[in-house]
Every structure is written in structure tokens, then in C-alpha cells.
Amino acid sequence: MGQKVHPNGIRLGIVKPWNSTWFANTKEFADNLDSDFKVRQYLTKELAKASVSRIVIERPAKSIRVTIHTARPGIVIGKKGEDVEKLRKVVADIAGVPAQINIAEVRKPELDAKLVADSITSQLERRVMFRRAMKRAVQNAMRLGAKGIKVEVSGRLGGAEIARTEWYREGRVPLHTLRADIDYNTSEAHTTYGVIGVKVWIFKGEILGGMAAVEQPEKPAAQPKKQQRKGRK
């Protein structure tokens, strides 16, 4: 059987950035990796209702900088920044170095694979029909400008005795094209019948120019100059 490689892993360094960007020598590497895992585990649990898309960790000079990408920055920050200050203290304790927490807003949650997958799982847990949840996610993504989307759910769908897999796809989802900007993520719905797995692939277009094009902020389009009409003398 043909197997699918992880769409994010194969594109790292080509059109996808890493979620942890730091360098460590052999002695510190394992400790850093462990603290990264614990920080992510804590933040994911603490901010379960804050629509967190991804957590990026950097380690500049004996400190840790955590960037939380979320669709609901208000919930993360809290009243007068109280919640984010509490998070900062706990992260500093876990990592053992001074911590800084930045918040990045996800402007279009319908085009973020993690948030789409989480939305479907929350609907499945509320006993919404799985086909309706999938179709709604596909329609919303295409309406907001996705070039293609594929949604797959797997498990005891609708409480069936035998587990099965169903999927919907609209538009193009080119998994082999390395320059294709494909956002992929998964989530799990814990229902009374068992666990239902959800996978989401969103194709946002092709990135020409590799990582340099990804890291550069988008420049505003130059306004065309109006040609001055010369009057008759």
C-alpha cells in the first residue's frame, strides 16, 4: 500500500518554518527538548478554549521566547494582562530561564488546519452529524479563498459498530508538490462511542522563492502611476 509522508515534515526548510528554533550543544539539547515538550503540553492544556493554532519556541541567550498563535488573543491575555503574566511565570519555572510570551493573532481561523480540525472535533463531541460538520468546514475554507481542502474523519462514525473512514475534498490538494503551501493538522474527538480522529489538509497556493518568500512580510502592491494628459496648447 502507498503511504503518505507527513505534509509538514517533508516541507520543513522548503516552505515551512520549524516550531522550535534554537541551537544547543550535546549536553543541553535533551534538556531543551524536554522543556519544549513540557511548555507546549502545559500551554495546550491551559489554553484549550483559546483556539491555539501553534506554539513557536525560540531560545535567545539564556532565555526562552514563546509565541502563541491564537484566534482569540483576548482569552490568552486576560483582564489587564493577568493571565499572560501567570503563563509567563509558569513557563519560566518549567524552562528554568527568564521567559517572554508574545501573542500572534490568527486572522482567518477557517484557513488554519489545526483550528478547523478542533472545530470539527468540538462539533462531533456535541453530537453534530459528522457529514454536516465536514461540509461546513469545507465550504467555509473555500469561501475564504483556500485553493483546496480535504477533511477526513475516522472511527465509529454515528455510533456504528464497525469503525470506518470518510472524507470530503474540494479544489486541489497537491501533496507531492514541495512548493505547495499545505497546512496539515489533526485532532481527536472523545465521544461516548470512542475516539474519532480528524485530519485536515488545506492548500493555500504555491510559494515561489522558498523560505525567503515565507519570511519576508508581504509588501503592499505599488499603486500604478496616473498618466498626466497633456492639454492642447
From Swiss-Prot:
| Molecular function in Gene Ontology | mRNA binding; rRNA binding; structural constituent of ribosome
Q: Give residue ranges for domain KH type-2.
A: 39-107
Describe the function of this protein: Binds the lower part of the 30S subunit head. Binds mRNA in the 70S ribosome, positioning it for translation.
**Organism's domain of life?**
Bacteria
Pfam families under this entry?
KH_2, Ribosomal_S3_C
Q: Keyword rRNA-binding on this protein? A: yes
Q: Does the keyword RNA-binding apply?
A: yes
Recorded family membership: Belongs to the universal ribosomal protein uS3 family.
In this UniProt entry, which cysteines form S-S bonds? none
Q: Name one GO biological process term.
A: ribosomal small subunit assembly
- Would you tell me the protein name for this molecule? Small ribosomal subunit protein uS3
- GO CC list: cytoplasm; cytosol; cytosolic small ribosomal subunit
Subunit and partners: Part of the 30S ribosomal subunit. Forms a tight complex with proteins uS10 and uS14. With proteins uS4 and uS5 encircles the mRNA as it enters the ribosome, which may play a role in mRNA helicase processivity. Some nascent polypeptide chains are able to cross-link to this protein in situ. In collided ribosomes contacts ribosome rescue factor SmrB.
Kindly state which keywords UniProt assigns to this record, in alphabetical order: Ribonucleoprotein, Ribosomal protein, RNA-binding, rRNA-binding
List the signal peptide residues: none
Q: Which CDD domains match?
A: KH-II_30S_S3
